[in-house]
């Protein structure tokens, strides 16, 4: 290492130190998905980030998605993927595939990545220890669904659920040890039926119940932008609501923002929308002065 490289390394460590001191002992819930789960270099940089967080005393809790992987396996099985209002119609056969992909393939791949990069992780679904109590999601028809449907009609999209409750005992047990919890967003109801739940919603609810310091949502965009295309680096919940009302925030970003807003309004200190396509995005957001995405706080 030459003198310039050594100087740069020292500068980076010094910049990170106050953040490490500030966040040591706190919990950070990370929704892991998008390109960060598909590119090998990004997968390994994410794993190294969470291992380092654990090493310096920050407790990461990971909730992951897996929509593209589910769609890929369904296609290989000759089963068409259907969506209503952005949600996958999940019949019993599709639910079996969801559980295989999320609870098996994707979850264990993340666990293996973390362990390969020097950490310890345990993979869970919401069915383990009844971690995620679910109820069936009820959708009302919209004009976009079908002209034949009345606006008040209920659409059955099968085993798609929403979070009714989170039992944190198993997360607390793992997070308080050397292990990093890796959670697949599959819930279970009182009758033992399984439900596919949006990973952003699960991450938000887990963050709320754990009273997490941060909720981090990895996305395929660099953050929230204003109407001129400039990144909005710091926003209050009041400002976010005004940006929704004036149409600056719209479309596919609305559910993520809704999840972040609800988390911050219910006890999470800050929520972050960051670009998962950037190597080491998580560490850059929480341990540097500038960060790399949009931070949302209550005031």
Curated annotation (Swiss-Prot):
Site label Transition state stabilizer, positions: 31, 256
Q: Does the keyword Cytoplasm apply?
A: yes
Catalytic activity field: N-acetyl-L-glutamate + ATP = N-acetyl-L-glutamyl 5-phosphate + ADP
Q: Which InterPro entries match?
A: AceGlu_kinase-like_sf, AcgluKinase_fam, ArgB, Asp/Glu/Uridylate_kinase, Glu/AcGlu_kinase, NAGK-C
* Annotated Pfam families: AA_kinase
As one GO molecular function, the record gives: acetylglutamate kinase activity
> In terms of domain of life, where is this protein from?
Bacteria
The protein's name is Acetylglutamate kinase
From which lineage does this chain's organism come?
Bacteria, Pseudomonadati, Pseudomonadota, Gammaproteobacteria, Oceanospirillales
């Amino acid at each position: 290492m030459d003198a310039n490289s050594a100087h740069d390394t020292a500068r980076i460590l010094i910049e990170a130190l106050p953040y490490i001191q500030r966040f040591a002992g706190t919990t950070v819930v990370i929704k892991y998905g998008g390109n960060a789960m598909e590119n090998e270099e990004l997968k390994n940089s994410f794993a190294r980030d969470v291992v380092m967080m654990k090493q310096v005393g920050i407790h990461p809790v990971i909730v992951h998605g897996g929509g593209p992987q589910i769609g890929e396996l369904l296609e290989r099985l000759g089963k068409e993927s259907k969506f209503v209002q952005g949600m996958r119609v999940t019949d019993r056969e599709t639910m079996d595939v969801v559980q295989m992909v999320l609870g098996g393939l994707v979850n264990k791949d993340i666990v293996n990545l973390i362990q390969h990069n020097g950490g310890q992780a345990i993979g869970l679904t919401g069915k383990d220890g009844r971690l995620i109590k679910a109820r069936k999601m009820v959708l009302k028809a919209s004009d976009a669904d079908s002209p034949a449907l009345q606006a008040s009609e209920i659409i059955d999209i099968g085993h798609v659920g929403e979070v009714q409750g989170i039992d944190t005992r198993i997360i607390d047990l793992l997070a308080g040890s050397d292990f990093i919890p890796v959670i697949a967003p599959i819930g279970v109801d009182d009758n033992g039926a399984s439900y596919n739940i949006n990973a952003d919603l699960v991450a938000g609810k887990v963050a709320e119940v754990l009273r997490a310091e941060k909720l981090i949502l990895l996305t395929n965009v660099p953050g929230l932008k204003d109407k001129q295309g400039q990144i909005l680096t710091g926003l209050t919940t009041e400002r976010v609501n005004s940006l929704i009302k004036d149409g600056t925030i719209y479309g596919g970003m609305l559910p993520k923002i809704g999840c972040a807003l609800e988390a911050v309004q219910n006890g999470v200190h800050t929520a972050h929308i960051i670009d998962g396509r950037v190597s080491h995005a998580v560490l850059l957001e929480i341990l540097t002065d500038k960060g790399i995405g949009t931070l949302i706080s209550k005031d």
